Amino acid sequence: MVSNLELQNKIAILLVSHGSSLPFAEVTFNEIKDKFNKATGFATEVGYMKVAEPSIAGAVENLKEEVPELEKIIAIPVFLAPGIHTNIDIPTLLGLSPLETDPRCPDGNYPDDHYLSIAEDVDFDGDIELLPAIGP
């Protein structure tokens, strides 16, 4: 049987947020991150789709540094409901297949200045499991 400590040495949590320019948003997400870490014991980072830092790719780098034997990242969108961000943007930013066709750009070729075109690629060789939005 695998112990919780063994799992903590191989699995980390990525909480994914849209991002905001409002300073209290970062404070709120750091509080959520700290509560999640305390409740689960797993290394936890917040990654932002846009506007705020760290980016999703940057948060993955932070997790890789914190958990040297990292094999799996469980990504949890901190959104109230599923939608374009949780079904298309976040999977794409994580290097996963979108869960549906993007009605904004059905061919998947985004303009050069679109955030999905300019975002950093996630550099992770392990598994990434994307859970549904954390909302109700």
Feature roles, as predicted:
Residues 1-136:
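Active-site-proximal alpha-helix that buttresses catalytic centers in soluble enzyme cores
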